[in-house]
Design a protein with these regions (language model features):
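Catalytic binding pocket for nucleotide-activated donors in carbohydrate/polymer assembly enzymes
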Residues: 4-16, 34, 39-123
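Amphipathic coiled-coil/heptad-repeat helices and related helical stalk/stem segments
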Residues: 20-22, 40, 127
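C-terminal alpha-helical cap of glycosyltransferases
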Residues: 116-141
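Short acidic alpha-helix that forms the nucleotide-activated donor recognition element
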Residues: 22-32
Length: 141
């Protein structure tokens, strides 16, 4: 996005980390060891669907709603870029042993499933059907 400042620009990643700034995400998300994103857009849904360990950077450019953040912390590896030591926290995750990261990732699965159900997939009701029914049953003024 024009004018967007990625938190990654101020971080020197470990040698084992390769940054792809504009990947073909629909394919590349399945071959990564970890995914790092910093915006809760449709990309979040794509990343979660891959079941690849996800590091989410909560930045001041696109802050999470506090209640969502609280649930996300239990679901993915969350780094709060509002904190002074956020770069250290990010480096801790990117330097983590792969097996250890996968083990922690799997422990978060029940919370992540709830998070996905609530915030990514949305309501279980068919809202569009409800709206159409409402429109069709309204009496003209």
């Amino acid at each position: 996005y024009k004018g967007r400042h990625s938190p990654w620009l101020s971080v020197i990643p470990p040698k084992n980390v390769a940054i792809h700034w504009h990947p073909q995400f629909d394919y590349s998300r399945y071959v990564a060891d970890i995914l790092i994103i910093d915006r809760a857009t449709s990309t979040l849904g794509w990343a979660l669907a891959s079941n690849i360990p996800l590091i989410y950077i909560d930045s001041h450019h696109s802050p999470l709603i506090p209640s969502v953040k609280k649930e996300m912390e239990k679901s993915v590896f969350l780094v709060d870029a509002h904190e002074l030591n956020w770069k250290k926290e990010l480096t801790k995750y990117t330097s983590m042993n792969t097996k250890k990261m996968l083990d922690k990732w799997m422990l978060m699965k029940p919370s992540r499933d709830k998070f996905i159900s609530k915030y990514v997939l949305g309501s279980s009701s068919n809202d569009s059907t409800d709206i159409v029914d409402w429109i069709l049953t309204r009496k003209p003024i």
